[in-house]
């Protein structure tokens, strides 16, 4: 199932005191939607106007919304929860509530597929603590927020092992930070049963998700061109990988709380 959009102006709306921040979310979804041609900004406008505060009112956290810079038909967002049971309760409340009932047809009309969803948890305590959560502009803003988020899905042969996570902490993360990433976070597959089966998630696979926030697109390009990852990380990482990683360059929407 879907729901997405974008909107906002230049009046800041602070994240409420009751809202959790990235490191307070033991359960996170990475949601990637494939849209009909020309419909991404239509969905972003709707999402940012109607589906941010109304979801958070049910106890979840909309962590960030993004355009995939290399896939014009892709909208990507992150959503966090306090637990799997909290996820069930929040999603039941939202998807059975008046906001979704009023806008679901418009949202669904933009989408080809909304089932590409990874259910994740922080890879270790504090692994997501570096992700910033900024105050949002008021609904009505357009364009984009600063920075670019490099999101890489590493497909693994098995669940992330202590040895892999040690390599992640001491080789992968420092390489990104030396290469200009301002903030880095890591998630791995949450293996609990989907508590809200109305919204499917990808099952039967093991992943490590790396999020690296760069201040500018040029900074990410400079890191990529440096080949530091290819030299210092890729050879050591290869034995854990089942196939080539998925790499996404994500531009925050105007109302994304996660941006540079």
Where are these regions (language model features)?
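Ordered, small/hydrophobic-rich secondary-structure cores
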Residues: 2, 13-89, 96-98
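Short, well-ordered beta-strand segments in beta-rich or mixed alpha/beta enzyme
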Residues: 28-34, 64-95, 116-117, 146-156, ...
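Short amphipathic alpha-helical segments
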Residues: 39-63, 160-188, 228-237
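Generic "edge-of-domain/loop-turn" microfeature
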Residues: 40, 86, 124-125, 161, ...
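A short acidic/glycine-rich loop-to-helix N-cap element
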Residues: 42-45, 105, 220-224
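Short intrinsically disordered coil segments
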Residues: 48, 94-96, 132-138, 169, ...
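Short, surface-exposed loop/turn motifs that are enriched in glycine and acidic residues
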Residues: 142, 154, 158-162
């Amino acid at each position: 199932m879907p729901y997405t959009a974008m909107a906002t102006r230049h009046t800041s709306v602070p994240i409420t005191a009751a809202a959790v921040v990235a490191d307070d979310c033991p359960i996170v979804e990475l949601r990637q939607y494939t849209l009909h041609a020309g419909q991404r900004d239509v969905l972003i406008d709707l999402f940012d106007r109607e589906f941010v505060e109304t979801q958070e009112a049910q106890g979840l956290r909309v962590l960030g919304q993004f355009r995939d810079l290399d896939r014009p038909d892709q909208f990507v967002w992150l959503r966090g929860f306090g637990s799997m049971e909290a996820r069930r309760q929040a999603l039941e409340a939202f998807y059975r509530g008046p906001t979704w009932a009023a806008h679901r047809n418009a949202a669904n009309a933009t989408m080809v597929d909304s089932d590409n969803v990874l259910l994740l948890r922080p890879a270790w305590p504090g692994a997501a603590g570096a992700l910033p959560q900024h105050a949002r502009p008021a609904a009505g803003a357009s364009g984009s927020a600063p920075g670019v988020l490099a999101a890489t899905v590493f497909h693994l042969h098995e669940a992330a092992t202590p040895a892999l996570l040690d390599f992640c902490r001491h080789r992968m993360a420092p390489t990104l930070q030396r290469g200009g990433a301002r903030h880095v976070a890591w998630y791995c597959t949450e293996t609990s049963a989907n508590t809200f089966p109305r919204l499917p998630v990808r099952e039967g696979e093991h992943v490590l998700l790396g999020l690296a926030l760069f201040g500018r697109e040029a900074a990410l390009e400079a890191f990529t061109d440096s080949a530091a990852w290819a030299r210092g990380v890729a050879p050591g990482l290869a034995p854990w990988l089942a196939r080539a990683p998925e790499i996404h360059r994500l531009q925050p929407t105007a109302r994304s709380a996660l941006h540079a």
